[in-house]
From Swiss-Prot:
It comes from Buchnera aphidicola subsp. Cinara cedri (strain Cc). Residues 2-184 form the tr-type G domain. Gene3D superfamilies: 3.30.70.240, Elongation factor 4, C-terminal domain, Elongation Factor G (Translational Gtpase), domain 3, P-loop containing nucleotide triphosphate hydrolases, Translation factors. The gene is lepA. This is Elongation factor 4. It catalyses: GTP + H2O = GDP + phosphate + H(+). InterPro entries: EF-4 (IPR006297), EFG_III/V (IPR035647), EFG_V-like (IPR000640), EFTu-like_2 (IPR004161), G_TR_CS (IPR031157), LepA_C_sf (IPR038363), LepA_CTD (IPR013842), LepA_IV (IPR035654). Its EC number is 3.6.5.n1.
Length: 596
C-alpha cells in the first residue's frame, strides 16, 4: 500500500495537463515511442479537434524511484473548462492528492483557483507544478508569488517542468512520491469499490471504472451494488496503461475497469459502491453530489423516424455523462423530441456533436434557457420551469425570479474598465474587487441567462484572451421578465419563444425577427414575421413575395385579358397564403443563440 499513489491532474484550460500526462506515460514506459501520440488520453475525435479534454481519463503506470523502489501511480487527467468542473470533482474524490498545473507564462487563472479550492475542500495534498518553463517569456518567480497571494497555498514543494520537452519530469515524479500520501485501505476488509465512471461497449455491455478502497476483486466474483438486490458475475477486469490490460485480480487502492455482463444501462450509476455478494460490506463510500444542469434546450431529430434511435443514443450518452439530463418534449413546430439539461453551452455543443458523429442522428437544437421560479397569485404557489412555452400568463403571476450566478473574473489590470462595462451591460452587480500586483479579481453577481449568452466569448474578446472566468449558481432573485413569442405567417412557433428582461424586450425582439427574415427563403406570397408579448405585437417585418410574370405569354391584345390574369394570380396567392406551408430552415432555431 505504501508504494501506491493516487492523484488527479487539475488546471485551467490550455495549461498543459494532457501534455504532462503524455510525458509521465512516456517516462514510465506506459507506451512505446511508436505508440505515443500527442494528447494520447484525449480519445475522442472532438477532443483532438478542439484541443481540449472533455472526459477525465485514468491511467496506471509504474515508476522506479532513484532509491530503486517500484511505485504504482494511478492518475486521472481531468478537463480544464468551467463546463466540466463536475468531471474534476468526481476525479478528485478517487484520489489522495492533486497536481495543480499552472502555465508559467499565463500564470494563475480562474479555474486554477476553483479547482484548487475543490481539492482543498476534499482535504487532498496539493503539489503545484509550473509548466512551460522552456518558453522565453516564462515567469516562475512571479507565478510563485501569485500562487501564495491569490490561491493561498504553500510553494515549498513546487515542481518546475516543461511537459513539451520533458525537462523536470523525473524531479516531478520524485516529488509525487514525497508529497502525495499513500492510501490507507485494507486488503483484508470486505470489498468496497467506488464507481467513478462508466460507458457502454456494444460487445461487452456496460464497462465500469472503479477505485477499490478496501478488499480485492477477481474474475468470477459475485458482486452487487450496496443497497440494491441485483447480483453480477465479474467476467473481465484490468487496468489502463493507457492500453487496456486484462488482469485476474484488482487489489486494494487500485483503479481499474470491470465488465460483469450488465446490459441494462440503468442498473448502475456513477458514485455507487460495489461489494461482494459473500462477506459483503454494508457501508457506502461517500456518494458524489448530484449535479444539476445550468441550462436547458430542446433537441429534436431532423427525421421523425429517428426518434427511437435518438432516445437510445441519449441513454448511452447519459451512462458516460451523468451530468446530462433529458425528458420527453413535444413541440407543435418540431414534433417529438427531448428537453435536455447541460452544464453550459460548450457541454451542449459537445452532446450535439457526439449525437451526430457517434450515432448518425441529425438534430435541431433550440436556444438554451435557464430555470425560472414563479410565485403564483393563487395560494402563493411556487412553480419552476425551464421551457419558455411553460411561462404562465402575466395575470397569474405574483412575481418571477431568475437564477443568479456568482462570477469570479481574474484579469490583468489594464482590462478592468472594459470588463466592468460588460458586467454592467449584462445586469451584473459588483460584490468585490481584489487587486494583486498586476492582476485583479472581480466578483460579480450576474443573471445566469446573461452568463450563458456569449458572456465568456465577449470577456475573452475584450481582454485579448487573458481574462478567465469561473461561475456558480447562488440562488434566485426577483426580476421583471417577459416572454417573447415569434409568429411566422401568423402562426406561433413555440420553439422560437424567448424569455428576457422587459427593458431589453423591444431591442431583442427586433434583432430576432430581422435575423429570421434573412434566413427564411422568399415564397410566392408575403410572409409576415412578428414578435409578440402576451397578445401584443411589438415588432414586425415582412418577407416580400416572389412574383411570377403571368403576362409573359400575353403579347399585346385586350387590356381586360391582362387584368383577368393578374386578378387570378392575386386570388391564387391569397389561397396559398392561407394553406401554404412556410419552409423554416434549421438555422432559424440557432438565431436566438446568436442574438447577442
Amino acid at each position: 500500500m505504501k508504494h501506491i499513489r493516487n492523484f488527479s491532474i487539475i488546471a485551467h484550460i490550455d495549461h498543459g495537463k494532457s501534455t504532462l500526462s503524455d510525458r509521465l506515460i512516456q517516462k514510465c514506459g506506459g507506451l512505446s515511442e511508436r505508440e505515443m501520440s500527442e494528447q494520447v488520453l484525449d480519445t475522442m475525435d472532438l477532443e483532438k479537434e478542439r484541443g481540449i479534454t472533455i472526459k477525465a481519463q485514468s491511467v496506471t503506470i509504474s515508476y522506479i524511484s532513484k532509491k530503486g523502489k517500484k511505485y504504482s501511480l494511478n492518475f486521472i487527467d481531468t478537463p480544464g473548462h468551467v463546463n466540466f468542473a463536475y468531471e474534476v470533482s468526481r476525479s478528485l474524490s478517487a484520489c489522495e492528492g492533486a497536481l495543480l498545473v499552472i502555465d508559467s507564462v499565463k500564470g494563475v487563472q480562474a479555474q486554477t483557483v476553483a479547482n484548487c479550492h475543490s481539492a482543498i475542500k476534499m482535504k487532498l495534498s496539493i503539489l503545484p507544478v509550473l509548466n512551460k518553463i522552456d518558453l522565453p517569456n516564462s515567469q516562475p518567480e512571479k507565478v510563485c508569488r501569485d500562487i501564495k497571494k491569490i490561491i493561498g497555498i504553500s510553494t515549498k514543494n513546487i515542481a518546475l517542468c516543461s511537459a513539451k520537452t520533458g525537462k523536470g519530469i523525473t524531479e516531478l515524479l520524485e516529488k509525487i512520491i514525497q508529497v502525495i500520501p499513500s492510501p490507507t485501505g485494507d486488503i483484508n476488509n470486505s470489498l468496497q469499490a467506488l464507481v467513478i465512471d462508466s460507458w457502454f461497449d456494444k460487445y461487452s455491455g456496460v464497462v465500469l471504472l472503479i477505485r477499490i478502497k478496501n478488499g480485492l476483486i477477481k474474475i468470477k466474483d459475485k458482486i452487487k451494488i450496496i443497497g440494491k438486490k441485483n447480483i453480477y458475475i465479474v467476467e473481465q477486469l484490468g487496468i489502463f496503461t493507457p492500453k487496456k490490460i486484462k488482469k485476474k485480480k484488482l487489489y486494494c487502492e487500485e483503479v481499474g475497469w470491470v465488465i460483469c455482463g450488465i446490459k441494462n444501462i440503468y442498473s448502475i450509476s456513477v458514485g455507487e459502491t460495489i461489494t461482494t455478494f459473500i462477506n459483503s460490506s454494508k457501508k457506502k463510500l461517500s456518494h458524489f453530489k448530484k449535479i444539476t444542469p445550468k441550462i436547458y434546450a430542446g433537441l429534436f431529430p431532423l427525421k421523425n423516424n429517428q426518434y427511437n434511435n435518438f432516445k437510445n443514443a441519449l441513454n448511452k450518452l447519459q451512462l458516460n455523462d451523468s451530468s446530462l439530463f433529458y425528458e420527453p418534449e413535444n413541440s407543435q413546430a418540431l414534433g417529438f423530441g427531448f428537453r435536455c439539461g447541460f452544464l453550459g453551452t460548450l457541454h451542449m455543443e459537445i452532446i450535439q456533436s457526439r449525437l451526430e458523429r457517434e450515432y448518425n442522428i441529425e438534430i435541431i437544437l433550440t436556444s438554451p434557457t435557464v430555470v425560472y421560479e414563479v410565485v403564483l397569485k393563487k395560494n402563493k404557489k411556487k412553480i419552476y420551469f425551464n421551457n419558455p412555452t411553460k411561462f404562465p400568463k402575466n395575470n397569474l403571476i405574483k412575481k418571477i425570479k431568475e437564477p443568479i450566478a456568482r462570477c469570479n473574473i481574474l484579469t490583468p489590470n489594464k482590462y478592468i474598465g472594459e470588463i466592468i462595462k460588460l458586467c454592467i451591460k449584462k445586469r451584473g452587480i459588483q460584490k468585490n474587487l481584489i487587486y494583486h500586483e498586476k492582476k485583479t479579481i472581480l466578483i460579480y453577481e450576474i443573471p445566469l441567462s446573461e452568463v450563458i449568452s456569449n458572456f465568456f466569448d465577449k470577456l475573452k474578446s475584450i481582454s485579448s484572451g487573458y481574462a478567465s472566468l469561473d461561475y456558480y449558481f447562488i440562488g434566485f432573485k426577483t426580476s421583471n421578465l417577459v416572454k417573447i413569442d415569434i409568429l411566422i405567417n401568423f402562426t406561433k412557433i413555440d420553439a422560437l419563444s424567448y424569455i428576457c428582461h422587459k427593458n431589453d424586450s423591444q431591442k431583442i425582439a427586433k434583432r430576432i425577427i430581422e435575423k429570421i427574415k434573412k434566413i427564411i427563403p422568399r415564397h410566392q406570397f408575403h410572409v409576415p414575421i412578428q414578435a409578440a408579448i402576451e397578445n401584443n405585437i411589438i415588432s414586425r417585418v415582412n418577407i416580400t413575395q416572389l412574383r411570377k410574370n403571368v403576362l409573359s405569354k400575353c403579347y399585346g391584345g385586350d387590356i381586360s385579358r391582362k387584368k383577368k390574369l393578374l386578378q387570378k394570380q392575386k386570388k391564387g396567392k391569397k389561397r396559398m397564403k392561407i394553406i401554404g406551408n412556410i419552409k423554416i430552415p434549421q438555422e432559424v432555431f440557432f438565431t436566438i443563440l446568436k442574438i447577442n
